[in-house]
Amino acid sequence: MPESQWNAQQARGAHVYQLKCARCHYPTTTRPLNGPGLQALTKVTAMPSGAPPTDERLTAVTLHGRGMMPATQLTDDQLQDLLAYLHTL
């Protein structure tokens, strides 16, 4: 979804992504940086781990980490904003 069509929550989520995720994940490609690229993450049938990309699974991985990905400290609002942004990719 083009940035011009984002709502306020998605725009806040993009800011959370820049602060917490961008150093390890590209947003507009599936090519890996330190972690997998996030393009179409919520639209694929399985994440690189093989698990489905449900909001619940994305929340668990974000908050608790997995493999090389560390746990991330986010407020509930930041997490919801980030999920809204991930759905735009």
Predicted features, each with a name:
Residues 13, 17-28, 82-86:
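The canonical Cys-X-X-Cys-His
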Residues 1-16:
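Electrostatic cytochrome c docking/interface patches
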Residues 10-14, 26-60:
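Gly/Gly-Pro-rich "capping" loops immediately C-terminal to redox-active cysteine motifs
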Residues 33-41, 61-89:
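Axial heme c-ligation environment in periplasmic c-type cytochrome domains
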Residues 5, 50, 71-74:
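Pocket-edge positions in alpha/beta enzyme catalytic cores
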